[in-house]
Swiss-Prot record:
Pathway assigned to this chain's UniProt record: Metabolic intermediate biosynthesis; 1-deoxy-D-xylulose 5-phosphate biosynthesis; 1-deoxy-D-xylulose 5-phosphate from D-glyceraldehyde 3-phosphate and pyruvate: step 1/1
Organism: Mannheimia succiniciproducens (strain KCTC 0769BP / MBEL55E)
Cofactors, names only: Mg(2+); thiamine diphosphate
Listed name of the protein: 1-deoxy-D-xylulose-5-phosphate synthase
EC number: 2.2.1.7
InterPro entries per the UniProt record, alphabetical: Dxylulose-5-P_synthase, THDP-binding, Transketo_C/PFOR_II, Transketolase-like_Pyr-bd, Transketolase_BS, Transketolase_C, Transketolase_CS
Native organism taxonomy: Bacteria, Pseudomonadati, Pseudomonadota, Gammaproteobacteria, Pasteurellales
Length: 617
């Protein structure tokens, strides 16, 4: 830590608050450099954190955390927060098995008020915490930091609408690191922000309100005049003022002096406050500033050169999906691709560039994405919703009410199904089979390799009803790709004939199942379809084998294995059944391989579980 003389002194925000204000720019420089060095050695989210260094320092300097409670939305930008709150020496373990969590996590630190990972939850939770604090006369400040992407979600506006109506004391900070909201940042804005947040202006404002309460017409006129003054400087301010917030900004989020002055003023204000700051994602590191998307989440890399490692492995399942999407769009102009702010992650970059008129990025709006697809289907188009398993949870009612009940031809391409790995419990795709298979009219498929994935996407696209294909994060296995053709719906594939034991595989754990089958001389069936199930195959296996083993990368509760048991129970087969899958717990972070091994879903673990079951059976 000899390169970080001030940062090495900071083991908690209390240490930070002992420093002089004129030392804070150096703290910011050291913090940014330390963040860059540590993430380059471990992997993780980089660009967002580089952009919030000054804000993080200012917040912990002005507010008495953890008594004053700081809530980060999503949490990608919270690495500097972790470094300043006693976890500096453990940053090399972030996102690793048994290491510190990739996002703010209540169990990890008293400074992490809300466990996060999904977007747009901070203001709702912050409002609840603020209401509780007011009821207890706690006297603490509640601060929510939300990005310009997360604030586009409906939940954020629902919370602000409620907070404005209640007039609850809380501060919402919009970290605006894109050009989409406002470009008005400069000396004038910083100066006006000090005025609007200052004690003199605020006192006059509050006193005037009390006087004007007896004169409603004049009060309304003055309110509109104030809103207009702010609106001239920042047109977006009118929206937040109408929601009941006192809007300040935008100000330069990298000017530590202005942040300190403005936050000091706003700390004393009553009611819902809104501070708009402008930052640059990747600030201070040229490669990240030039490519903030590429440096959003990074593997280990050489930060001196800024070169990210190039993958020489087989294509990812996301890439396989993207290639299928382009191939299909070439033949069908009725195809419409939809993503809720996951263009890069879902493999849709090429599609969006080649077919811009057939592509919609609806931002962080999963509910809207699904119902938009329903409307397009009603209009005669063939929508494909590309969405992560963990984010599909946010649109569950829309899948049922707007798609399935109406039996509309919408294809859900469910990425990141199963174990995702380093992002931990909030991002594992553990539940989609369980919450989807109970929905009538829905066809659900789980490919065992990239060729099967293509064929299933094609089958779902052509079936004329709601369909879902779930596939994992990461690289495919390198099998040869066939020309597109439709699979027979509800029919499985016998992969290996054995005796006594039959492994019914759902998804990409098939290679592990085959390894085990060679040792145990087991039959292996790639089930392909979770819904409708191949009843004929299940009945045949139950009659000719002593033990059925279901294998899936989904929680066992309510998953594909449970569906097999339902079939066996209805037919009253006398056969032993072992369900292998994810446990009834939230699965922690680690590499995919580490997590599968720990859950005994690698080949060795599967064999061990089957042998233990056979001893009991």
């Amino acid at each position: 830590m000899q390169n970080y003389p001030l940062l090495s002194l900071i083991n908690s925000p209390e240490d930070l608050r002992l420093l002089n204000k004129d030392q804070l720019p150096q703290v910011c420089n050291e913090l940014r450099e330390y963040l860059l060095e540590s993430v380059s050695r471990t992997s993780g989210h980089l660009a967002s954190g580089l952009g919030t260094v000054e804000l993080t320092v200012a917040l912990h300097y002005i507010f008495k955390t953890p008594f004053d409670q700081l809530i980060w939305d999503v949490g990608h930008q919270a690495y500097p927060h972790k470094i300043l709150t006693g976890r500096r020496e453990r940053m090399t373990t972030i996102r690793q098995k048994d290491g510190i969590h990739p996002f703010p996590w209540r169990e990890e630190s008293e400074f992490d008020v809300l466990s996060v990972g999904h977007s747009s939850t901070s203001i709702s939770a912050g409002l609840g915490i603020a209401i509780a604090a007011e009821k207890e006369n706690a006297g603490r400040k509640i601060i929510c930091v939300i990005g310009d992407g997360a604030i586009t979600a409906g939940m954020a506006f629902e919370a602000m609408n409620h907070a404005g109506a209640l007039h609850t004391d809380m501060l919402v900070i919009l970290n605006d690191n894109e050009m989409s909201i406002s470009e008005n940042v400069g000396g004038l804005n910083n100066h006006l922000a000090r005025i609007f947040s200052g004690s003199i202006y605020s006192s006059l404002r509050d006193s005037s309100k009390k006087i004007l309460d007896t004169m409603p017409p004049i009060k309304n006129f003055m309110k509109k005049t104030e809103e207009h003054m702010k609106g001239v400087i920042s047109p977006i301010s009118t929206l937040f003022e109408e929601l009941g917030f006192n809007y300040i900004g935008p100000i330069d989020g990298h000017n530590i002096e202005e942040l300190i002055a403005t936050l000091s003023n706003m700390k004393t204000l009553k009611g819902p406050q809104f501070l708009h700051i402008r930052t640059k994602k990747g600030k201070g590191y040229t490669p990240a500033e030039q490519d903030p998307i590429g440096f959003h989440g990074v593997p280990k890399f050489d930060y001196h050169t800024g070169q990210l490692p190039k993958s020489t492995a087989t294509p990812t399942y996301s890439q396989i999906f993207g290639e299928w999407l382009c191939e299909t769009a070439e033949q069908d102009e009725k195809l419409i691709g939809i993503t809720p702010a996951m263009r890069e992650g879902s493999g849709m970059v090429e599609f969006s560039n080649r077919f811009p008129d057939q592509y919609f990025d609806v931002a962080i709006a999963e509910q809207h994405a699904v119902t938009l697809a329903a409307g397009l289907a009603i209009g005669g188009y063939k929508p494909v919703v590309a969405i992560y398993s963990t984010f599909l949870q946010r649109a569950y009612d829309q899948v049922i009410h707007d798609v399935a009940i109406q039996n509309l031809p919408v294809l859900f391409a469910i990425d990141r199904a199963g174990i995702v790995g380093a992002d931990g419990p909030t991002h594992q795709g553990a539940f989609d089979l369980s919450f989807l298979r109970c929905i009538p009219n829905l066809i659900i498929m789980a490919p065992s390799n990239e060729n099967e994935c293509r064929l299933m996407l094609h089958t779902g696209y052509c079936c004329g009803k709601p369909a879902a294909v779930r596939y994992p994060r990461g690289n495919a296995i390198g099998v040869e790709l066939e020309p597109l053709r439709k699979l027979e719906i509800g029919k499985s594939n016998l992969v290996r004939q054995g005796q006594d034991i039959a492994i019914l595989n759902f998804g990409t754990l098939l290679p592990n199942a085959l390894d085990v089958a060679e040792k145990l001389n087991a039959t292996v069936v790639d089930m392909r379809f979770v819904k409708p199930l191949d009843h004929e195959r299940i009945n045949e296996l139950a009659k000719t084998h002593r033990t059925l083993v279901t294998l899936e990368e989904n929680t066992i509760q309510g998953g594909a294995g449970s569906a097999v048991s339902e079939v066996v129970n209805i037919q009253q087969h006398h056969v032993n059944i072992l369900h292998l899958g994810l446990p009834d717990e939230f699965v922690a972070q680690g590499t995919q391989q580490e997590v599968l091994k720990e859950l005994k879903l690698d080949a060795t673990g599967i064999e061990e579980q089957i042998k233990n079951f056979l001893r009991i059976a």
